[in-house]
Amino acid sequence: MILEYDGVVVDFFEKFPAHWKNIGIHVSGGADSALILYCTALMIHSRDQLNEVKIWPTISYDAAAPNCKVHNIGKDVVKYIQDLPIGKSIQNPYLHTYHQTDIDTESNNTYLREARKYLFNIIGCDTVLDGTTRGMPGLPRPTGSYDPNEEELIAMTKQPGIEFVFPFATVNKKFIAAQYNHFGLKDLSNMTSSCVISSASPCKECWWCKERYWAFGSYDGGVQ
C-alpha cells in the first residue's frame, strides 16, 4: 500500500516489517494519527495477519482537563476504525493522564513516560507510530510547539534502531487530506479535531485551525 499525492510518495505501510507483532499508536484525536491507525489496520488486513499482529492504541490527556474534547475524540476514532471490517487487529485503547512536567525528555519526541512504560515494558511493542507532519509553507508553528527541522524529519522516517516512527514526518496536511479523500474517509475526517481550543466548535483562529482549512478546505467537523 503506497500513498501518493502531488508527486510525493509514502511507502512506510507497504514496507513495514512483517515480523512486527505488536504495534503501538498514539491516538491524539487529530487527523494524522487517525489516518495512521486506519492505514496500519488496512495493511495488516491486506496481509492476512489479523490473527498475528495487534495494534495497541494509547490516548493521553491532561490530568487538569479530564473531559477535554480530544480525549473523547480519540476514543471515538479508535471505536470507529475498530468497527470497520479491517479493524479487528485494533485492541481497546490504553487511557492515561499526564501532567505538563511529566514529559519524556530523553528523546526528540514528546511521548509520555506512562505510554512508553505500557507499550514497551508491558505489551512489548516492536515499534510505536506517531502522527507528526510538516507544517504549512510560510506560516511557522507557534513558539513553543514541536517543529523539527528537515534533518530531524527525515531521520524520523527511518526504522532501524528507532523506537518511535513518524510515517508522515516529511509530508504536510494536504497530503493527509488527499489520503482521506482517496480512501473515502469523510466521516472519520470530520470526527477528528485540529483546533487546540477545547470547545464545541473550531475557533478558526489558531494555527491548527488555519492548517486544517488550508489542507481540507474546511475546519473541524466540516465547518466552513
Residue ranges of model-derived segments:
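Nucleotide-activated chemistry modules centered on ATP-dependent adenylation/adenylyltransferase
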Residues: 1-224
